[in-house]
């Protein structure tokens, strides 16, 4: 078997950035940031939503996402000007060179 194929499994400190709630859980998350929690130093991972802030677990109907998809879309494309509609042009059938169009069949 190959050696060193699996990532290192260790205790990682997860911090909910919206509530400040901290918890330790086993993970393979890789980071250089560390933080002291309950007297021990752990690698730290900042999360935007956890069980302490998600509406399903808290029972509240507060808006968790500070900037949603629609807001991001409007922010990105608010300065874009609308394009003028293109005028319709007639479409001609293009045949390869040397080929002639078959004559139309007569209806009976």
Swiss-Prot record:
Domain of life: Bacteria
Comp. bias regions, Basic residues: 97-108
Any matching Pfam family: Ribosomal_L31
Region ranges (Disordered): 85-108
Keyword entries, A-Z: Ribonucleoprotein, Ribosomal protein
Cellular-component GO terms for this entry: ribonucleoprotein complex; ribosome
Molecular function in Gene Ontology: structural constituent of ribosome
InterPro entries xref list: Ribosomal_bL28/bL31-like_sf (IPR034704), Ribosomal_bL31 (IPR002150), Ribosomal_bL31_B (IPR027493), Ribosomal_bL31_sf (IPR042105)
Gene Ontology biological process terms, A to Z: translation
Keyword Chaperone found: no
Chain ranges passing through the membrane: none
UniProt xrefs under NCBIfam families: L31, PRK01678.1
Subunit field text: Part of the 50S ribosomal subunit.
Family stated for the protein in its record: Belongs to the bacterial ribosomal protein bL31 family. Type B subfamily.
Protein's recorded name: Large ribosomal subunit protein bL31B
Gene designation per UniProt: rpmE2
């Amino acid at each position: 078997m190959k050696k060193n194929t699996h990532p290192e499994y260790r205790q990682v400190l997860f911090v909910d950035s919206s509530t400040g709630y901290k918890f330790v859980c086993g993970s393979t998350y890789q980071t250089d940031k560390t933080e002291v929690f309950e007297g021990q130093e752990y690698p730290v991972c900042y999360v935007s939503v956890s069980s302490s802030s998600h509406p399903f677990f808290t029972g509240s109907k507060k808006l968790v996402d500070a900037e949603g998809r629609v807001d991001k879309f409007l922010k990105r494309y608010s300065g874009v000007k609308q394009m003028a509609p293109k005028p319709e042009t007639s479409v001609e059938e293009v045949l390869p060179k040397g080929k002639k169009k078959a004559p139309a069949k007569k209806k009976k």
